[in-house]
């Protein structure tokens, strides 16, 4: 019982500390590639495509993040260890992932009407270039 209490308090303290928001280091644009799987037709054969893509991370509320990816916004709940999960109530879609150092991993799955789509994004944080005078 004590380890659970300590864990809960650590997460609560980290999320509630307005002056030291652990999410600040994760904000920005990540460049990488996506491994995309999509079932086609009734036989559910999968096509796999690799594409170069970007994903942008911004804050939402006290504990959330928004991932802007492929013209969609994915709202997630995050933990101070970098893991995040979907906040959606849609039973056909789910997403999760983690941010470790300057790397972001994002998994998305949508299953509806016999069609399945899975995306695995892996990216590195883009470093902004500044011109020094």
Q: Can you name each region flagged by the protein language model?
A:
Residues 80, 107-133:
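Edge beta-strand at a domain terminus
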Residues 30, 99-108:
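A short hydrophobic beta-strand element
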Residues 54-101:
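Contiguous, well-ordered beta-strand patches that form the walls/edges
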Residues 35-38, 68-73, 110-113:
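Short, solvent-exposed aromatic-acidic interface loops
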Residues 48-51, 89-92, 115-122:
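Amphipathic hydrophobic-ligand
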């Amino acid at each position: 019982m004590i380890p659970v209490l300590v864990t809960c308090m650590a997460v609560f303290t980290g999320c509630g500390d307005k002056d030291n928001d652990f999410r600040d280091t994760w904000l920005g644009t990540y460049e990488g590639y996506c491994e995309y799987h999509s079932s086609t037709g009734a036989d559910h054969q999968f096509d796999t495509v690799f594409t170069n893509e970007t994903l942008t991370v911004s804050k939402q509320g006290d504990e959330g993040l928004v991932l802007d990816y492929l013209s969609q916004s994915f709202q997630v709940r995050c933990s101070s260890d970098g893991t995040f999960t979907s906040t959606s109530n849609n039973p056909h879609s789910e997403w999760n992932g983690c941010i470790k150092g300057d790397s972001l991993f994002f998994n998305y799955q949508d299953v509806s009407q016999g069609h399945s789509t899975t995306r695995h994004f892996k990216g590195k944080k883009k470093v902004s270039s500044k011109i020094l005078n």
